Amino acid sequence: MQSSPAQSNPMPQNLQSEPAPAQPFNIYQTSLTASSGGNSYAGTYSDTPNQGTTMFDGQEANSSTISLTITENGSPIVTEIDTVYYLENPYQPLGLTLSYNGGQFDFLYNSSDPLPSTLTVGGSGPLGSGTYFVANSNDAIGSLTETYAVASSPLGGSSILLTTYATGTVNGQSISEAIGYVINGGEAMGVASVDIQLNGTTVHFDSSCNGCWDY
């Protein structure tokens, strides 16, 4: 009796992965461009760790400053400056103070989840959630949930794309933002794209990225 050949199992595919970069990220000012609905948009984004520590919500914390500006057909429509407060080693976000087009808000995390030590293409998960308050008060005015997802580079190469998502409401208005970071060698090389809700419509911004995909 002739034996049938053994069936071969396909080799498992090795998914691309990179060490997670240390937080907060250090992103030099990046130019953003977009067009939507016949309008032309331009902007800048940066994320800069600050020196020293300060008090936040009753405890000593480190901080970083995130800046986002957007113009529509040459006219300013968004000026946002966030000061993010966090603990180091391990990184744990505490909250932030937010200035958005002149309005002042506070945000406190109710829960936070660190990025995994290794980012693998196809992976995703929670980053945290919290509550918005009127500045310097206990009056809650909204909430926010943050998640992440990892994808391969759209241009090939060894870099991967880490996208963080933030969705929620403030004063009854929905907010939505997605930021795509180029990750290589355990470092955030730059911002590839920003998606942000403007007047109820999500607008996709591409960045110059200044060669951050060249790996």
How should each PLM-predicted stretch be described?
Residues 2-76, 136-215:
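Acidic, serine/threonine-rich low-complexity disordered tracts
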Residues 76-135:
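Predominantly extracellular/secreted and cell-surface proteins with exposed
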